[in-house]
């Protein structure tokens, strides 16, 4: 028997659908909150990766909790070592290293899947962080340690291809680095523009979001804000 769907039209549609925030925007915003003062993110979806991000924030010493549909994050990170098992479960966990480097000068995490450094697509992240003064090594199988002995500084960085994750990592690192960072070959996805808008709301200075070249003037201290992340365009479609 043929499987088919028959849609009978002729009736006007009405009503409204609430679109949750996009997970791919929320995760870097949660990482960015470690750089800022008190942050409230509106209408955050209750997903497993969001719960893992909460655990990473708490593991770093930040206060993070739900208030209804909103996520509240406050307090600067105190611990440079991210919970290993949680970090392994989420590919975006590498994003949380950049704020730790910027604030504490050190970040330690398990790589997603517990793989060796060369086995995961984070080479663009690491190459850019090196240009900003970071040094990395493996403390054991799948365990990555990053340090910035003299602090992170601005740099001119060109990505080999427009990686969204690497662009987010380097924007996070540059937002509180010393000096100005110019990032060429950057990803142009809406989530990048959303991250820049959030950081600028928190008194960062980022220009060019949405284009392939970003200019980021580092600010040592960022304020907090209330922010509504980008709606999930996949859900909306």
Give residue spans per PLM region.
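Structural preference for solvent-exposed beta-strand-turn elements
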Residues: 1-237
């Amino acid at each position: 028997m043929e499987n088919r769907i028959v849609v009978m039209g002729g009736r006007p549609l009405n009503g409204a659908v609430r679109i949750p925030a996009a997970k791919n925007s929320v995760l870097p915003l949660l990482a960015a909150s470690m750089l800022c003062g008190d942050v409230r993110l509106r209408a955050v979806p209750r997903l497993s990766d969001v719960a893992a991000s909460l655990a990473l924030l708490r593991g770093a010493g930040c206060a993070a909790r739900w208030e209804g549909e909103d996520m509240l994050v406050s307090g600067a990170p105190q611990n440079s070592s991210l919970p290993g098992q949680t970090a392994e479960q989420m590919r975006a966990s590498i994003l949380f290293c950049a704020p730790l480097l910027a604030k504490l000068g050190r970040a330690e995490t398990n790589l997603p899947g517990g793989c060796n450094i060369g086995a995961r697509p984070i080479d663009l992240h690491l190459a850019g962080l090196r240009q900003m003064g970071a040094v990395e090594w493996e403390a054991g199988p799948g365990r990555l340690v990053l340090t910035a002995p003299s602090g992170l500084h601005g740099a001119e960085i060109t990505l080999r291809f427009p990686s969204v994750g690497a662009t987010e990592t380097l924007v996070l690192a540059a937002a509180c680095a010393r000096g100005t960072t110019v990032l060429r070959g950057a990803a142009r996805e809406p989530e990048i523009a959303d991250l820049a808008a959030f950081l600028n709301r928190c008194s960062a200075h980022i220009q060019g979001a949405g284009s392939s070249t970003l200019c980021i003037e580092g600010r040592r201290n960022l304020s907090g804000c209330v922010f509504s992340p980008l709606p999930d365009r996949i859900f909306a479609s």
